[in-house]
Amino acid sequence: MARVNEPFEGVIMYRRDYRERDLLVKILTDRRGPLMFFVRGAKRKGFKLASDILPFTYGSYVGILADEGLSYIVSAQETHHLTGIGADLNRNAYATYLLELVDQAFEEGRALGGWYKQVMAALNLINTGRDPQVVVNVLEVQLLNRFGIAPVWDRCVVCGRSDLPLDYSEKMGGMLCLHHFAEDPYRFHLTPKTVAYLRLFATLNLAKVDQVHVDEATKRQLGRTLDKIYDDQLGLRLKSKRFINEMDSWTNRLLTARKNPGTDDEKKPAGS
């Protein structure tokens, strides 16, 4: 059966060298999820699609979409660059992690349904300067279902009550209310704010929000909570996530150094 050209929407996830003049380009498509495209001659000077296949470019394309093996791009109809992501290291790091997480969560060649719009909404929020950690945390909560984990966020898993203080339990697979905290001595001891945001994030449609304000202390606890769930229950340790953690560590060191500018000098021996 001859393969035919099809129009599709997509965002460039990443690309890598293939042979001397060619590239393999991973695109998150609206119709078939993540697909790997072979782009012949993409590294040649003056290649007509050069700007259309840069990372964090999105738009309308035409190509051959393969159920198995490599797909092919024929043309780009209209494309745009997420320039805010490309110009900022922090935004770039979180957007890269988001797309790597999505790549792990969805099989190649399977339609995404509403997920494509949710991912694009997340990228657009990051691109326009919204807090990238908060945006990515929303998707981390929602993508757990795709990985086969379905925490109960909105009520106690034992009695179903939602009107009492709640805390998260990995052992029980969701929230415990105050009356059932004893069911898990290793519950997370989350603050009410963190619990409230986890419950909100589980159903939040990013296409319908402009901003979600989260204070720094709650952001830290949200980050630690989701890192622990992904580490303990999925064993998912992505390279892009490690980079974010390292970047946060560098930032904390710089902030500490600025708060204590004389610390290093005070440690030096007299006369040095």
UniProtKB/Swiss-Prot annotation:
Keywords: DNA damage, DNA recombination, DNA repair. It comes from the Bacteria. One of its GO terms (cellular component) is bacterial nucleoid. GO terms for biological process: DNA recombination; double-strand break repair. SUPFAM superfamilies: ArfGap/RecO-like zinc finger, Nucleic acid-binding proteins. NCBIfam families: reco. This is DNA repair protein RecO. The gene is recO.
